[in-house]
């Protein structure tokens, strides 16, 4: 919000909180074609997880694990975001671990940065060597 007073622009910061609430983060182990748009990604979420539940984020990577898409159902609609690593790749679990894995927010932060998220626990504590 901005106000124009005395010929100067004043900016008022009033941020109510996060725009998109995410209560659970799910990672699919099978790769997805990164050309997929919102409808295709949503169909994939339903196929892998059974449903797109409100306030849940669903993560998919391509075969090379250097690109990731995140689909979030915010309770009203669907958001689809993409991330690409220019160097290296995301630490993605193999298919042998199952169809999906639940992550906590600290693990998601590590994953998005390309770090080994499996070693990060609650509060950013390293739990595995």
Residue ranges and their predicted role:
Residues 1-129:
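Polybasic/polar functional segments that serve as interface/processing modules
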């Amino acid at each position: 919000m901005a106000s124009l007073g005395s010929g100067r622009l004043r900016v008022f910061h009033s941020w109510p909180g996060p725009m998109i609430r995410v209560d659970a983060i799910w990672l699919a182990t099978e790769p997805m074609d990164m050309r997929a748009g919102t409808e295709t990604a949503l169909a994939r979420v339903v196929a892998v997880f059974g449903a797109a539940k409100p306030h849940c984020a669903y993560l998919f990577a391509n075969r090379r694990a250097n690109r990731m898409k995140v689909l979030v159902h915010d309770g009203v609609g669907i958001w689809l975001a993409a991330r690409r690593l220019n160097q290296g790749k995301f630490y993605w679990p193999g298919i042998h671990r199952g169809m999906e894995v639940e992550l906590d927010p600290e693990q998601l932060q590590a994953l998005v940065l390309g770090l080994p998220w499996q070693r990060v626990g609650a509060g950013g504590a390293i739990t595995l060597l």
